[in-house]
């Protein structure tokens, strides 16, 4: 466990000497678990772009601090801004507004339609 602590850290892969250690290049790697994405997975590098992204293909689209209004906590990169915090179609969508925290507000054909849906229902005259 204590062999080459400065070079290896807690690495479990002898093929990636010095690339997995927590104490080597902390600014570049951070806690990366993927040696192919050097410097793209670390928590301390590009916090505004990556945040806590787990998908290297969606650079900067998954971070909690980037585009919070567009992505929210969406788990589906194909539904940008349409999911809010919903991770499954059918749970909370179409109930909070239309999509929750969607970046695109519900579109009404006419202003009167919006007034009718948002107005408090009045008692029918007797």
Swiss-Prot record:
What is an annotated GO biological process for this record, any one?
neuropeptide signaling pathway
Q: Which domain of life is it from?
A: Eukaryota
Ordered alphabetically, the record's keywords are:
Amidation, Cleavage on pair of basic residues, Neuropeptide, Repeat, Secreted
Q: Which residues carry this modification: Tryptophan amide?
A: 8, 20, 29, 41, 50, 62, 71, 83, 99
> Where located?
Secreted
Disulfide bonds, which pairs?
none
Per the UniProt entry, the propeptide covers: 1-2, 11-15, 32-36, 53-57, 74-78, 86-93, 102-126
Give the record's GO CC terms: extracellular region
Which parts of this chain are annotated as the region Disordered? 1-126
Basic and acidic residues compositional bias, start-end: 107-116
Similarity annotation: Belongs to the LWamide neuropeptide family.
Which function does this protein serve?
Metamorphosin A may be part of an internal signaling system involved in control of metamorphosis.
- Report what the protein is called: LWamide neuropeptides
What is the taxonomic lineage of the source species?
Eukaryota, Metazoa, Cnidaria, Anthozoa, Hexacorallia
């Amino acid at each position: 466990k204590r062999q080459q602590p400065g070079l290896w850290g807690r690495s479990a892969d002898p093929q990636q000497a010095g690339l997995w250690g927590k104490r080597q290049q902390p600014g570049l790697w951070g806690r990366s678990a993927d040696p192919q994405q050097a410097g793209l997975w670390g928590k301390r590098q590009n916090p505004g772009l990556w945040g806590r992204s787990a998908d290297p293909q969606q650079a900067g689209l998954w971070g909690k601090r980037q585009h919070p209004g567009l992505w929210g906590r969406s788990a589906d990169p194909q539904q940008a801004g349409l999911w809010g915090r919903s991770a499954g179609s059918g749970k909370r969508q179409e109930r909070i507004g239309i999509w929750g925290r969607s970046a695109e507000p519900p579109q009404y054909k006419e202003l009167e339609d919006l007034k009718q849906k948002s107005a408090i229902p009045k008692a029918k005259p007797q």
